[in-house]
Regions:
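Active-site region of glycoside hydrolase catalytic domains
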Residues: 170-329, 335-358, 386-389
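Catalytic domains of carbohydrate-active enzymes, especially glycoside hydrolases
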Residues: 88-110, 336-344, 383, 387-390
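Acidic/histidine-rich helix-loop elements
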Residues: 59-89, 117-124, 165, 307-332
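An active-site-proximal structural segment forming one wall of the substrate-binding cleft
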Residues: 37, 84-105, 115, 120-152, ...
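Aromatic-rich peripheral "rim/lid" segments of glycoside hydrolase catalytic domains that contact
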Residues: 362-447
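N-terminal carbohydrate-binding accessory modules
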Residues: 25-104
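Surface-exposed, active-site-proximal loop segments in enzymatic domains
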Residues: 69-78, 111-130, 153-169, 201-220, ...
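C-terminal motif of bacterial Sec signal peptides marking the signal peptidase cleavage site
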Residues: 17-18
């Protein structure tokens, strides 16, 4: 989402940040984490998984931050981890997530930070993948399920659209998932692989640049102003590509062996839109390695209405909204979530991988909570409880403080300083504490 770049303008001067944090740049190889209760998950169905995953949180704007444009590629992992304004990730953050009522965490990653594909280097820097593994281990040790994906990554998925760049797209795709999949193939079943973020769909035809090399698509320019018939044809093409690479992904991960044969795999929806994903043109892959058990899930995001959940201030495409909750707005949200029953009815798990209410920007440049945010989030969580979806809030040190924050100390330097750890506001804390799997399970048992 564009909202993930909210820090970009304000943090441009911090691109040469200090890396004198708590993590040494010295390379360390983490151990392979295996849960003591892994046997419970080996033969678990996707619909059982989404129930025990409870509700979760994203480690946003952290390992997904893209800094290659000014930092370069294959640098110290902390340079990317800091470059969108987030503090260095610490183990204590994950125990705090668990104590706050979260049962799962999504760790978005931009792997191309650690590669240099513009110059033909497709090997992930070992320091970077080891840093990701350290963070994954901390989350698993805190008894959290973990979703690990390929996130922004400079929008390279646009290579899948035009036929002339599709071969290169598969080269990048193979490089990422051959290395990531193999690295984590013996990890606990509580680690879930998500094939991509929001790029599967219209993102196949998105102009982008990486490493000084520009990729453009005439389709991107024309599609939004095209006729309804042309737009339908464009979507049909995107649905076909999703089906092709989705199947390719499942077959690839299963063939890696180890626990990847039965690992839960999360498939991105079309633009992660509930409406486009619920469309019958979207097809889930076949999972021939698990014909008698459902191990696949589908990922969608929820930011609606956009003027309320995405905008922090007025934009060219809309005026910021600071209230939500009319009968019509509630009805529309409920209808959005009801669409995804198409998948649960077929035995597939549904992950609402992101949802959030943007903070409201004040005239002095500070940000405050919007009116009715608790009402909006409560209704989202109620819908997820009703339909057995697993929701994960998009979080970037806003509602939930990570114990550290990144602070500018000069024009060219910043550092991490201590701050609160956990939810700052009691109403938000209570909302999520009451939605943990343990609390909801206890409530059902007592009925």
């Amino acid at each position: 989402m564009n909202m993930k770049l909210i820090w970009f303008n304000t943090l441009f001067l911090l691109i040469f940040t200090s890396c004198s944090g708590l993590l040494s740049s010295k390379e360390n190889t983490p151990y392979v984490y295996v849960s003591v209760d892994d046997n419970d998950y080996e033969n678990m169905e996707a619909l059982q998984l989404t129930k025990v995953m409870g509700n979760g949180i994203n480690l946003g704007n952290t390992m997904d931050a893209c800094g290659g444009g000014w930092i370069g590629f294959k640098k110290d992992p902390l340079e990317y981890e800091h470059c969108w304004g987030m503090p260095e990730t610490q183990k204590v953050m994950f125990t705090a997530y668990k104590e706050a009522g979260f049962d799962c965490v999504r760790i978005p990653v931009s792997w191309l930070n650690a590669m240099d594909i513009a110059n033909g280097d497709y090997t992930i820097d070992s320091r970077y993948i080891n840093r990701v593994a350290t963070i994954v281990n901390w989350a698993l040790e805190a008894d959290l399920f973990v979703i690990l994906n390929d996130h922004h990554d400079y929008e390279w998925c646009a290579l899948f659209g035009p036929e002339e760049t599709r071969e290169e797209a598969y080269r990048v795709f193979d490089a990422i998932w051959d290395q990531v999949g193999t690295y984590f193939k013996d990890y606990s079943y509580k680690l879930i692989f998500e094939a991509a973020n929001e790029q599967w769909g219209a993102g196949f035809y998105h102009a982008f640049s990486i490493g000084g090399k520009n990729y453009t698509s005439d389709t991107e320019v024309s599609v939004w102003s095209s006729s309804a018939a042309d737009f339908t044809a464009f979507q049909n093409k995107c649905y076909d590509i999703i089906e092709e690479i989705g199947q390719y992904y499942v077959d690839k991960i299963r063939a890696q062996g180890g626990k990847n044969v039965k690992r839960f795999l999360l498939m991105p929806g079309y633009d992660t839109s509930m409406t486009y994903t619920a469309d019958r043109r979207y097809k889930m892959p076949q999972d021939s390695a698990n014909e008698d058990i459902k191990k696949l899930l589908v990922s969608v995001h929820y930011y609606g209405p956009a003027t309320y959940s995405i905008l922090s201030e007025d934009a060219g495409w809309g005026k910021v909204a600071n209230s939500w909750g009319t009968a019509q707005e509630v009805k529309e949200q409920n209808e959005d979530f009801a669409q995804m029953q198409r998948f649960t009815n077929e035995g597939y798990g549904v992950i609402v991988g992101e949802y959030a209410v943007a903070m409201l920007k004040q005239s002095d440049g500070t940000y405050v909570r919007k009116n009715d945010d608790i009402k909006w989030m409560t209704n989202v969580l109620d819908n997820c409880d009703k339909y057995n979806y697993c929701p994960l809030i998009w979080e970037c040190n806003d509602y939930f403080k990570r114990g550290w924050k990144r602070v500018k100390i000069s024009d060219w330097e910043s550092q991490d300083v201590k701050c609160e750890l956990g939810f700052v506001d009691s109403d938000v804390a209570e909302l999520f504490k009451s939605r943990s799997y343990a609390v909801e399970k206890a409530a059902l048992t007592s009925e």
